[in-house]
């Protein structure tokens, strides 16, 4: 794909007949009038100069609507403080573009492709438009290969697909960002490929923490970061995921690499779209969301895919408003996913981390034809025991555990051990717990849970299973409590 010019070059080369005038400013919404026959296309980037003292800057606007009578309605990607009516606006003739190439790794960019850690860096690189079509259908290649993470609960019950779309669902404060950072630590280190991180509408502090952690882990050199955080206008938060995805597409299509794309948080992308939709005066749809919600989500998700011989593996954090999974924002995301990991407040309250709900999480490749008969059998037995334990909760709460049959008592004790054994020390939480993160190979995970479901560890105290790694850790913890495996 041909390179596009940078914003500065576009501005300098603009002709007088591609300029218009600001006629209305309402927050981030700017109406611009152009000469007849020179109305810019939808998604074109426009530039306006703010010359008001300390607010002086070049403002980037994106065309969102054609209003008729040579008027266009645009959304600003920066604060419009200091912008006044009558200011000249230049049509660049192109949509917003971001730098691509191997050199973007190790740096932080914003949604416009401007380098934040080294101002001016990347302006002379090849640029790609952030508005691109997904690969043609005949180039797509479905993947069923498992991506091993070393987290027991994930590898056993919700195996991730290499080249697939994975989402971490959860309400506020249940550990989505920590788990995303954990996956970056684990997969980026073991994966050895290129990673792209999109910070969409989340906390600036978390972005800074991630930057420092990646440097300390020596993974930053293989990672490109693109941020549009909470304090940014809705136009930026709506486009930052596309900017990061465009960089990832270059690594997939031009460099022929397998790429990891992390997005935190996909709900903020939807939320920004809702804000923009309201600002543009569109009639809201269900629960106040934009009527174009499914289209906008599809445009993003359809580009995250595997083509012949190369892939983009996407891991997305999804905030669930008020823990309501029927909310249109998370519900629209479900349809595009290969694996879902649901973080539960009830699991979190037990102190089990990661707080994954094993009964609510799922994966399309948890199938004997993909993961193998043994893995599938053990996973289904674990799910059966946990489901039966859940069914017995009401009886235990009302009548007490003593009223259960001997068989059910044994199952409950086994289920409590399974629950605790699904917890694990995480690398991202080392500074809080003082315990090093543990990685458990898939083969060992399957063997350990197979023995656990068969009752081989029924004599081991429950607390021995809490926040440990594999069988070696279990043996040490059991011995410290006066038991042997």
UniProtKB/Swiss-Prot annotation:
EC number per UniProt: 7.1.2.2
Topology term for the membrane: Peripheral membrane protein
Molecular function via GO: ATP binding; ATP hydrolysis activity; proton-transporting ATP synthase activity, rotational mechanism
Keyword Cytoplasm belongs to the record: no
Binding site for ATP: 170-177
Known catalytic reactions: ATP + H2O + 4 H(+)(in) = ADP + phosphate + 5 H(+)(out)
Keyword Transmembrane: no
GO cellular component, one term: proton-transporting ATP synthase complex
Pfam families (alphabetical): ATP-synt_ab, ATP-synt_ab_N, ATP-synt_VA_C
Described purpose of this protein according to its UniProt entry: Produces ATP from ADP in the presence of a proton gradient across the membrane. The catalytic sites are hosted primarily by the beta subunits.
Self-association state and partner proteins as the record states: F-type ATPases have 2 components, CF(1) - the catalytic core - and CF(0) - the membrane proton channel. CF(1) has five subunits: alpha(3), beta(3), gamma(1), delta(1), epsilon(1). CF(0) has three main subunits: a(1), b(2) and c(9-12). The alpha and beta chains form an alternating ring which encloses part of the gamma chain. CF(1) is attached to CF(0) by a central stalk formed by the gamma and epsilon chains, while a peripheral stalk is formed by the delta and b chains.
Protein name (record): ATP synthase subunit beta
Species annotation: Mycobacterium avium (strain 104)
């Amino acid at each position: 794909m041909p390179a596009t010019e940078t914003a500065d070059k576009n501005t300098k080369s603009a002709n007088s007949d591609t300029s218009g005038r600001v006629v209305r400013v309402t927050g981030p919404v700017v109406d611009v009038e152009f000469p007849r026959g020179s109305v810019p296309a939808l998604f074109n980037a426009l530039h306006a100069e703010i010359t008001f003292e300390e607010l002086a800057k070049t403002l980037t606007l994106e065309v969102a609507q054609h209003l008729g009578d040579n008027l266009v309605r645009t959304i600003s990607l920066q604060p419009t403080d200091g912008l006044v009516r009558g200011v000249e606006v230049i049509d660049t003739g192109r949509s917003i573009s971001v730098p691509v190439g191997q050199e973007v790794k190790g740096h932080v960019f914003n949604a416009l492709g401007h380098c934040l850690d080294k101002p001016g860096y990347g302006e002379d690189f090849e640029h790609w438009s952030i508005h691109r079509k997904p690969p043609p259908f005949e180039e797509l290649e479905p993947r069923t290969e498992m991506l091993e993470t070393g987290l027991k609960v994930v590898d056993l019950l919700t195996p991730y697909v290499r080249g697939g779309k994975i989402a971490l669902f959860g309400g506020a404060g249940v550990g989505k960002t920590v788990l995303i950072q954990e996956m970056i630590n684990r997969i980026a280190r073991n994966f050895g490929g290129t990673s792209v991180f999109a910070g969409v509408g989340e906390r600036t502090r978390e972005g800074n923490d991630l930057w420092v952690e990646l440097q300390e882990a020596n993974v930053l050199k293989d990672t490109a970061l693109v941020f549009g955080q909470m304090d940014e206008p809705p136009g930026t938060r709506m486009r930052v995921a596309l900017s990061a995805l465009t960089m990832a597409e270059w690594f997939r299509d031009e460099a022929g690499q397998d790429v990891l794309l992390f997005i935190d948080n996909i709900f903020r992308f939807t939320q920004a779209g809702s804000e923009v939709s309201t600002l543009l005066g569109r009639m809201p749809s269900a629960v106040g969301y934009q009527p174009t919600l499914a289209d906008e989500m599809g445009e993003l998700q359809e580009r995250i895919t595997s083509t012949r011989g190369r892939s983009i593996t996407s891991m997305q954090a999804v905030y669930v408003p008020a823990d309501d999974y029927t909310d249109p924002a998370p519900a629209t995301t479900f349809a595009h996913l290969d694996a879902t990991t649901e973080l539960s407040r009830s699991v979190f309250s037990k102190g089990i981390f990661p707080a994954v709900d094993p009964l609510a999480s799922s994966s399309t490749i948890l199938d004997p034809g993909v993961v193998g008969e043994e893995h599938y059998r053990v996973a289904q037995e674990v799910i059966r025991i946990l489901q039966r334990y859940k069914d017995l909760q009401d009886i235990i709460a009302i009548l007490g555990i003593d009223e259960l049959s001997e068989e059910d008592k044994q199952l409950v004790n086994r289920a409590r051990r399974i629950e605790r054994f699904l917890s694990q020390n995480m690398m991202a939480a080392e500074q809080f717990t003082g315990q090093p993160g543990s990685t458990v190979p898939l083969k060992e995970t399957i063997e350990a849970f197979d023995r656990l479901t068969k009752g081989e560890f029924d004599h081991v105290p429950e607390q021995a299973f809490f926040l440990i790694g594999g069988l070696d850790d279990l043996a040490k913890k059991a011995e410290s409590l006066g038991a042997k495996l």
